[in-house]
Amino acid sequence: MASPCDPLGCDEFFRGGFARRKASSYRSRGLDRTAARMLAFLRERGIAGASVLEIGGGVGEIQLELLRAGAARAVNLELSPAYEAEAAGLVREAGFEGRVTRRLQDIAVDGDGVEPADVVVLHRVVCCYPDYERLLAAAAEHARGLLVFSYPSHSVLARMVLGAENLSFRMRRLRFRVFAHPPDRMLSVLREHGLRPTVVHRGMAWQVAGAER
């Protein structure tokens, strides 16, 4: 049974309409470019028969592509319940019932019952979480082989954009915030937990880092 968790405002921001748009976009266009780069990193290193843990996977599109590419099973941990109906629909359409488990749980606060996995994925998740060190440490501890995550650029322009977004959230009285955490420090957290990180892609908006044990 999933443990109770503080959604950190994610339940206010990521609601049913957002989930429906994400699922519709995936059905019509597939993975976004950043997610596709993450998938390529994992496929190049081999995922046949692998177990997958995705933290904050939303409607689960990356998990589905990993299963299509040969992964055995996937677990998704989420803070917002709004994704569940759309995610279940995508799983049914893909024919992967019984191979995907979804839970409402904050692994950084409570990792009880979360088994280590061969592959750990965090797509646009660390930017929504204030304590990146705790989150990435928990993710790394659960990665038996590979970990890949995406995060916003740390450029001045990117930080200004995120600052403007946070101002709008405050004006709308939303608890949700976004963060541009320092990339070097995030990679150091992975090293401290036995992973060898490498930057896979540096984009103007989004960057991707992968790591191996």
Map each language-model feature to its residues:
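Class I SAM-dependent methyltransferase "Motif I" SAM/SAH-binding loop
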Residues: 56-58
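Class I SAM-dependent methyltransferase SAM/SAH-binding core
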Residues: 61, 65-99, 104
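A short, conserved alpha-helix within the catalytic core of class I
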Residues: 129-139
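Short alpha-helix
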Residues: 176-194
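A short SAM/SAH-binding and catalytic strip from SAM-dependent methyltransferases
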Residues: 119-131
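Conserved beta-strand signature within the Rossmann-like core of class I S-adenosyl-L-methionine
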Residues: 144-153
